[in-house]
Amino acid sequence: MSLVTALNGLDLFLVGLMGSGKTTIGKLLAESLGYTYVDTDSLIENVTGRSIPEIFASDGEAGFRQIETQVLEEVASYRRLVVATGGGIVIRPENWSYLQQGLVIWLDVPIPELLRRLEGDQNRPLLQTEAPATTLQALWEQRRDRYAQADLRIAIEASEDPEVTMQRILEVIPSVLKNSADSSPAEIET
């Protein structure tokens, strides 16, 4: 049985901290599976006509999270999607009712590598602080238990090519589908 057949239209939701590769790996997965790629942050910008930093500035994080939940609810009603989510989508418990309609994949990248990837990125409102490393570590501490609720954890090291990460995900999905009754996420190390 092919992987696409085994998935039977099940959406793949990529979660992880900002800079973890959700966009890059999401596009690769979608292309490989013949799925449609969707980025929740891009959808939020399209729906509101504002950038993420503008939404944070005018509506605060709480306002942004409400819009994010509405967008996720809509996205979850479709099938055959690979969805790159915003890093904080796991915070709101109600979002899990939508995420769990698909296969949730946590892209787990070490903090130093995330900082390297995000250096100079002005489109990350939560990192516009005097100490981005401290902020990123705090976000990790706040969200780690939520990310751990994913069906699959993929540990990614700095030197790993996104194509390799995509292949590792594709190779392990069948066993995750087979063992979906298990409550702990499968873990794939590099």
From Swiss-Prot:
The keyword Cytoplasm applies. Binds 1 Mg(2+) ion per subunit. It is found in: Cytoplasm. ATP binds at residues 19-24, 124. CDD domains: SK. Its cofactor is Mg(2+). The keyword Magnesium applies. PANTHER family: SHIKIMATE KINASE (PTHR21087), SHIKIMATE KINASE 1, CHLOROPLASTIC (PTHR21087:SF16). Belongs to the shikimate kinase family. This is Shikimate kinase. The gene is aroK.
